[in-house]
Amino acid sequence: MGGEKFGFLIWILSIPCLIFLCYGYVPVDNYLINCGSSTNVTVTSRVFISDNLASNFLTSPNEILAASNRNSNSDIYQTARIFTGISKYRFSVARGRHWIRLHFNPFQYQNFQMVSAKFSVSSETHVLLSDFTVSSRVMKEYSLNVATDHLELTFTPSGDSFAFLNALEVVSVPDTLFSGDPSFAGSPGKFQGLSWQALETVYRVNMGGPRVTPSNDTLSRIWEPDSEFLVEKNLVKSVSKIASVDYVPGFATEETAPRTVYGTCTEMNSADNPSSNFNVTWDFDVDPGFQYFLRFHFCDIVSKALNQLYFNLYVDSMDVVENLDLSSYLSNTLSGAYAMDFVTGSAKLTKRIRVSIGRSSVHTDYPTAILNGLEIMKMNNSKSQLSIGTFLPSGSSSTTKKNVGMIIGLTIGSLLALVVLGGFFVLYKKRGRDQDGNSKTWIPLSSNGTTSSSNGTTLASIASNSSYRIPLVAVKEATNSFDENRAIGVGGFGKVYKGELHDGTKVAVKRANPKSQQGLAEFRTEIEMLSQFRHRHLVSLIGYCDENNEMILVYEYMENGTLKSHLYGSGLLSLSWKQRLEICIGSARGLHYLHTGDAKPVIHRDVKSANILLDENLMAKVADFGLSKTGPEIDQTHVSTAVKGSFGYLDPEYFRRQQLTEKSDVYSFGVVMFEVLCARPVIDPTLTREMVNLAEWAMKWQKKGQLEHIIDPSLRGKIRPDSLRKFGETGEKCLADYGVDRPSMGDVLWNLEYALQLQEAVVDGDPEDSTNMIGELPLRFNDYNHGDTSVNFSVAKEGRFDEEESSVDDSSGVSMSKVFSQLIKSEGR
């Protein structure tokens, strides 16, 4: 009986293969299961077999089949299988890519209310869903590259909850569908290793056309219309010429996208006003913290001849392709189907991907642009996750794997023991050398300063001095056990509390949130950086605590909070223009000090108004060094590193090239300058499209010479024109597209001092002289590190904790303005 049942199953599974023959692609594996059902169901010519026939694929501690949702318009959503314990599906498959489609439609069955179900789904290599809940019908589609002869899917209920599934698809994917190395969106280079990435389909969109159902797609995909994603629907028109589509050999095929997608498009509606200059934009909400694979589908169905369509393609306002001529890609074929692949990491910093098309600025005879289709797929992170949550897979429980592991362990156990013993010996010798050499290697610390700890986070011996360590009991006493009434802020690292130490010192206590994406690396960097610095314009670190796996940083308390809170959103009194200039000058001094250290320069990497704090006298201090990076070696121009920072302040060149320099801080500081001037957020999605990004908005008015039109209303009529002009010119230079064109922080500092002097009094000579740009400054003032040492003493060595030098500037508090007044007046020399 069992043989007959299995033979029938094979026959059933062969039916879809016969159907696919008429489309050209025959999947090697094609498992379609109607979970919870005792009968087969045909959906759009595909047969989903009953749960009874699929029982050979499932290992589950309980057999609960639910069937009560008779209101569903699709048979596969009328039943479900409920898992009350860890359950596994195991399929024999050919190696290669496979679609995994999980169908969910919650309903109530007996005591099981499926909307309250919470569970995780994982393969042997990737986490697909973590702590997943579902309130309405949804289909989750994944593409996994299977490297073995089987695929295992595990359903794990969270806590006392349960899991459920309405239908399951495991179907082969053509090997050529995801191949090659896609380009990075907006930056040079290519992403290598796409073939082994796990992908989750987030959006699959048919631009300008209707919804495409599985019956009209050779790979049974669903394509949604683009209308709900368009930002301005009145700027476009839909075009449909399905019969014109030409699949050119060697390029896109019907497996890439169906004819219905390539035969329709969304086109710029520029016919009424061909001279108008606008972009067509689509916005897509995504999960932050991941890279995304983007596939653009193009087919020129709007031109009457070759070389009549040139346009630009943008992703998150970055140029991806300029002057795109589709016919040049397709061997001079009109209406040829073509796909372009990119990888973007911009979603790591935001919850949205913005895609735009716009007319070419070079080929203006044909002012239009098109897009036929778009696919957006989430890529697994470094932890092989496609969903971030608390779930951690325990690994395969296969008996075979355990046996193999045991055999290997017994075989090489003695060898490993020798290696471990040898390793201990090497570490012991190295530790002795490091201690003799006063190394900064990070090692565990105990509360008494020794190098062993059972409960401490792995940290470093900070400059061989444990005086920075503060006991947890002292921190709790200072904050009244982290009383929420003492909370004064919250950030990416965790909450900040106001506290007071035994000696009466007021402190700000930053306590890490265990769920924060910032962790040990940022904690370590903050301590390492701030323990080296002593400067009046950098926030001082008082100590840290790492007991009981806590990560706590204790700083000097800044009475007036963040610069951001004094600009907008808090209802505080408005700052005067002089106060704002002095705050900018103080911040610039702090950054200049970081960039021009005695050893390697330090790049802050997260300059923003929220990281500039103000003391009781409104003196500015730069804070938050968790993302800071030591600058390049003397013979190098940059540091290659993963992009980190805050959206809106991020240097676009750093984002494109992933090459960090001091000029990245200069760009961010330029954004802060315009934020100070305009008193508005750097990104404000509530405003019109052209005003959303402050840097772009301010640069537009600065280049017009009309910056006064967008300044903080409370400052109108209170800023001298020449002071505003110098401030605007300086900010404009900071926001140059390329770092080489930006000034150093020393140049910025000099010009800000100049702007302050222009505000306070008219300098000798013609005030129009103040219009000179940064690049036109006398050579003497272009770089504080190379000028006349008799002039530069208060800047070039500003603030390093050196007894002889600190008396000159840092400790004495000599105003830069006094020195500056000698620089700009001829009689001062």
UniProtKB/Swiss-Prot annotation:
Residues 482-755 form the Protein kinase domain. It is found in: Cell membrane. Its main location: membrane. Gene3D superfamilies: Galactose-binding lectin (2.60.120.430), Phosphorylase Kinase, domain 1 (3.30.200.20), Transferase(Phosphotransferase) domain 1 (1.10.510.10). GO terms for cellular component: plasma membrane; plasmodesma. Residues 1-24 form the signal peptide. Its EC number is 2.7.11.-. Glycans are attached at residues 40, 216, 279, 380. SMART domains: S_TKc (SM00220). Residues 428-829 are cytoplasmic. SUPFAM superfamilies: Protein kinase-like (PK-like). Residues 25-406 are extracellular. ATP binds at residues 488-496, 510. It is an enzyme of class 2 (transferase). Keywords: ATP-binding, Cell membrane, Glycoprotein, Kinase, Membrane, Nucleotide-binding, Serine/threonine-protein kinase, Signal, Transferase, Transmembrane, Transmembrane helix. The active site is at residue 606. One of its GO terms (molecular function) is ATP binding. Belongs to the protein kinase superfamily. Ser/Thr protein kinase family. This is Probable receptor-like protein kinase At5g59700. It comes from Arabidopsis thaliana (Mouse-ear cress).
